[in-house]
Amino acid sequence: MDYLKTVVPSQLMAERGANLVVINPGSSNVRIGFASQDVPFNIPHCIARHITQQKDDTPRLSVRDKMLNCHATPSQNAERERAYDIIASLLKIPFLDEDMPSANQALPPKMGRVDALSSQQNKDDSKFTWTDVMDRSIKSSTPIVDKDADVDPLQRSTPDDTEPNSEENMYKEIIFGEDALKIPPSESYCLSHPIRRGHFNISQDYSLHQVLEDLRTIWNWILTEKLHINPRDRHLYSAILVLGETFDNREIKEMLSIVLCDLGFSTAVIHQEALAAAFGNGLSTSCVVNIGAQVTQVVCVEDGVALPHTALALPYGGDDISRCLLWVQRRHCTWPNFQTDPVNKPIDMLMLNKLKESYSQIRSGSFDAVSVVHSYEHEKSVGHQKTKLSALNVPPMGLLYPRVLVPEEYPPPPRSWFQDYDDMLEDTWQTSDSLYSSGNGGFGMWDNYPMFPTRLKKFDNIGLVEAIVSSILSTGRIELQRKLFCSIQLVGGTASTAGLAPVLEQRVLNTIPSNQPIEKAEVLQSRSYPLFVPWKGGVILGVLDIGRDAWIHREDWAKNGVHIGSGRKYRDSYFLQAQAMCYYNS
């Protein structure tokens, strides 16, 4: 303890971080890296497998995600247009029907095609190239032997009787990351996202076994290809799982089993994403607002402990804002005549995300921009068109008025998924901690939580401002509420949206009931890129955890399963906060 009070943070990171791997999985991306790194690898959380087509079938890319409603219903469209007009009045921009072209106007002038672009315009970030799905390394029938003696069992080839230089094996069997999102639509691949809307993406067409296999394969590929950790050496490393509050107990168990039993880490620990985000910014008390790609979570943290009754989940995020951007342009008749389909063509979602990150912001008044939009209808002809994007300040306002977003609905896991009878957490969460005083840690952060349906409150149509106010007021103590209203912390990729923080400050303060003696609301500026704050917090918690009471060993997990923790707060939470502040101030 005395050593930690005097050690230089950079030295501590070098000593303790080299053999720690921090994993922060999300619905759209997974962030993985060594604790000694400044920033993690941020890789799309997906996998594409080559599928064999029947002779009569037309080769095509299939997306395994099964949405309940891929298109908005007429009532949803009506609500969306009303929400747009509300936003338009607040931002002082024209309503939808005030900015439409006349009937005799074939194409607005802003949609003129551009045949020649300047060198600067050619550098547009929204342009992507198709993934080459052919395995160029296969040139003969001689088997390719890996330079390492140990072969990773997760990446062994399956059929021994197939010629390596056959036409079928010329295709890459598995494609990961962004390359998987850029596979041409005419290629025979099945694209899968194992996590959607903060849960395992289980459906009738995507079984639990397949979800776990894909998670294992994706993480193994990142560890091998990006972090260069040989499978035979993984027993020398420990893993820190930074998990969002949306995951239920069984999903947490399965991911822990993947890390310890399948990937081969010697020990592992789990930290809540909200708690890690607070420590990632050097705080021990904060209202953490995590705006992810598909889920927004609001959780209050007090003295290094996430308060379970304050946790809220909102089923929308950055991806919904990107799709709303497309809808707004089409309603304004500014989008080119391209078959842009972010649901069925992942490369279109990549383009929309780039446009959103480049142009969307919250500000008053008309806000337009000229950009080059690309068409990815066919891999042999990638067209482009220069267009004027209109009302770019409307889509991010969907965080405050979610009816303008109309998010896709992913089917929840079947009810039998929650019947995990060997999970003691679901049976003992109301039991006194004194009964388990001899517990050796493990799930200490979760063992006071009920099972998922009552642990996390979900709201479909409330805005982010109402969620923040509701979460903070649910704490019930005025002094704590004042601290939390002055310590609102935005994390996640969408948290970087220009103009979001001041709008939230003003609207949160105006939404607080008049009978509450609260005079101030403040959104704190993030100390680093908001997307990586929870990951960095996991690094700090892992490096500074000297006792490792909650760490689980691979042998213990395989033999005994769930360990009941002590349910206590961090005994040294204030000390951890001081160390975190020291780390950032050095």
From Swiss-Prot:
- Return one Gene Ontology term, BP aspect: regulation of DNA-templated transcription
GO cellular component assignments: Ino80 complex
Give the span(s) annotated as Disordered: 141-169
Q: InterPro entries this protein is in? A: Actin (IPR004000), ATPase_NBD (IPR043129)
Q: Which family does it belong to?
A: Belongs to the actin family. ARP8 subfamily.
Q: What is this protein called?
A: Actin-related protein 9
Q: Which organism is it from?
A: Oryza sativa subsp. japonica (Rice)
